[in-house]
C-alpha cells in the first residue's frame, strides 16, 4: 500500500490506463493525429471516425442520440453554454431561472452573471438532508420561468436528487430543465429519456478520463435551441466552435464505455467500501453524516467531527488525500456554502471532511484510513478546550465569547 492514500475521487480521478492507451494512439505521426474537420484526406477521415465512435460511446451511457452530444472543454463550459445559451435564446419568452443554493459554482456564478444582465434567479434552499421537494420547485415556477437548473448528484455531500419527478414537472409546464450530472454519470444509471431532461452537463475527468474535455447533451425532440457562446468555424453543429481535440474525445469515449460496462459491479464494491469506512468511524462521539445516507451516490461520505477544526484535521490526516469541500473552493478558509445551506453552523461546517472513494481504492486503504482518523480525532480533541467544555456539560451555544 502506497501513501498518501487518495480519497478525493470527487475532485478528480486518475486516468484509467486503458483510457491513456487509447489516447496515445491519437497523437503522433503514426496515429490518428488528423483534424476531424479535414474532409479532403484520410488523416481527417480517420480522426473523424474516432470522434464519431467516442460520440456514440458518450451517448450510449446516458441513453441519448449521438447527434445530441456537443463536446466542450469540460463541465464548467457545458454549464455556461446550457444556462447562458438558453437564457439568451429564449429571452423573449421570459427572464426567470430557478436553481438551488447547493449547485456547483459553475452554475451559481453563471446565474449571477445573468442577474447582472437583467435576468431574475430564484435560489432554492434544500431540506437539512440536502434534498429538494417537488412542491418547493413547483412553488418557485412562474409564468416567465424559462429554465430550471438542478444538479443530479451534489459534489460535496453526494445526495441524489429525484430528477425524473422534476423533469416531469418542468415538461408539464413547458419549462426547460438543465441538469449538472458531473457526479452521477458513470456512477449511477442516467437515462435522459427516463429523467426527462433537456440539457445535461458531463465531464470526463470524474469518470477516469482526461481533464479538459466534457460534453453537453442537448435534446433534439422536442428541440432545444441554444445561443452559441464560442464562435468560429461552426463545429459541433454551430453550438461550440473549435478544432476537436481527438485524443481527449477518444479518451472520454473509452472512459464512458468502461463506466457503462463496470458500473453495477464497481458501484457495489465502492458502496461496500463506503459502508466499511462509515462503520469504522460512526461510533466516535459527536460525529455526524452530512446529506441523506439512503439517496446517495456510492463513493461519497461527508462527515462532521464536532469540536475539531477542519484544517487541523486535514493536516493530521496528511496520509489521506481528502478535502473539506469541493476542490474549487478548497483554497478558501470559508466554511462550505453547501453545508451552510443545509443549516449547519460555521463550527460544524468547518469540521467536515469529504471522503470519496473510487475505482482504485482498496479495503486495506480504508482500514488504514479508519485507524488514522480514530487516532487523529482522539489526539486533536484532547488538545481542544471546546471538547473539554463539552465533556463538562457546558452548552457551547450559550457561551458569550469575548470579541477582541
Curated annotation (Swiss-Prot):
Pfam families: Aminotran_5 (PF00266). Homodimer. Forms a heterotetramer with IscU, interacts with other sulfur acceptors. Master enzyme that delivers sulfur to a number of partners involved in Fe-S cluster assembly, tRNA modification or cofactor biosynthesis. Catalyzes the removal of elemental sulfur atoms from cysteine to produce alanine. Functions as a sulfur delivery protein for Fe-S cluster synthesis onto IscU, an Fe-S scaffold assembly protein, as well as other S acceptor proteins. The modification N6-(pyridoxal phosphate)lysine is found at residue 206. It comes from Aeromonas hydrophila subsp. hydrophila (strain ATCC 7966 / DSM 30187 / BCRC 13018 / CCUG 14551 / JCM 1027 / KCTC 2358 / NCIMB 9240 / NCTC 8049). GO terms for molecular function: 2 iron, 2 sulfur cluster binding; cysteine desulfurase activity; metal ion binding; pyridoxal phosphate binding. Pathway: Cofactor biosynthesis; iron-sulfur cluster biosynthesis. NCBIfam families: IscS, PRK02948.1, PRK14012.1. This is Cysteine desulfurase IscS.
Amino acid at each position: 500500500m502506497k501513501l498518501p492514500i487518495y480519497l478525493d475521487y470527487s475532485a478528480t480521478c486518475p486516468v484509467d490506463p486503458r483510457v491513456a492507451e487509447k489516447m496515445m494512439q491519437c497523437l503522433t505521426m503514426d496515429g490518428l493525429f488528423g483534424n476531424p474537420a479535414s474532409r479532403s484526406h484520410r488523416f481527417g477521415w480517420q480522426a473523424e471516425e474516432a470522434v464519431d465512435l467516442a460520440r456514440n460511446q458518450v451517448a450510449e451511457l446516458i441513453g441519448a442520440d449521438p447527434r445530441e452530444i456537443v463536446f466542450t472543454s469540460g463541465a464548467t463550459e457545458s454549464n455556461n453554454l446550457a444556462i447562458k445559451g438558453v437564457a439568451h435564446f429564449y429571452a423573449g419568452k421570459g427572464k426567470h431561472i430557478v436553481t438551488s443554493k447547493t449547485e456547483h459554482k459553475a452554475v451559481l456564478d453563471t446565474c449571477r452573471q445573468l442577474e447582472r444582465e437583467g435576468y431574475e434567479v430564484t435560489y432554492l434552499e434544500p431540506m437539512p438532508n440536502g434534498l429538494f421537494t417537488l412542491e418547493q420547485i413547483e412553488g418557485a415556477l412562474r409564468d416567465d420561468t424559462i429554465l430550471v437548473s438542478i444538479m443530479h448528484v451534489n459534489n460535496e455531500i453526494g445526495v441524489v436528487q429525484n430528477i425524473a419527478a422534476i423533469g416531469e414537472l418542468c415538461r408539464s409546464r413547458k419549462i426547460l430543465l438543465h441538469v449538472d450530472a458531473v457526479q452521477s454519470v458513470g456512477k449511477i444509471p442516467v437515462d435522459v429519456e427516463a429523467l426527462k431532461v433537456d440539457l445535461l452537463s458531463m465531464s470526463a475527468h470524474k469518470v477516469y478520463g482526461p481533464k479538459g474535455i466534457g460534453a453537453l447533451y442537448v435534446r433534439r425532440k422536442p428541440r432545444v435551441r441554444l445561443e452559441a457562446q464560442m464562435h468560429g468555424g461552426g463545429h459541433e453543429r454551430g453550438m461550440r466552435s473549435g478544432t476537436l481535440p481527438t485524443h481527449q474525445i477518444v479518451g472520454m469515449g473509452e472512459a464512458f464505455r468502461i463506466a457503462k460496462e463496470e458500473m453495477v459491479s464497481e458501484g457495489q464494491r465502492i458502496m461496500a467500501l463506503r459502508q466499511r469506512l462509515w462503520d469504522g468511524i460512526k461510533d466516535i462521539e459527536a460525529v455526524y453524516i452530512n446529506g441523506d445516507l439512503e439517496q446517495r451516490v456510492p463513493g461519497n461520505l461527508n462527515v462532521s467531527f464536532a469540536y475539531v477544526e477542519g484544517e487541523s484535521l486535514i493536516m493530521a490526516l496528511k496520509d489521506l488525500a481528502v478535502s473539506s469541500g469541493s476542490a474549487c473552493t478548497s483554497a478558501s478558509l470559508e466554511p462550505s456554502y453547501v453545508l451552510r445551506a443545509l443549516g449547519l453552523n460555521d463550527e460544524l461546517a468547518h469540521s467536515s471532511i469529504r471522503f470519496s472513494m473510487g475505482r482504485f481504492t482498496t479495503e486495506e486503504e480504508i482500514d488504514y484510513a479508519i485507524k488514522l482518523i480514530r487516532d487523529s480525532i482522539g489526539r486533536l480533541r484532547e488538545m481542544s478546550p471546546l471538547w473539554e467544555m463539552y465533556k463538562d456539560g457546558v452548552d457551547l451555544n450559550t457561551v458569550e465569547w469575548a470579541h477582541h
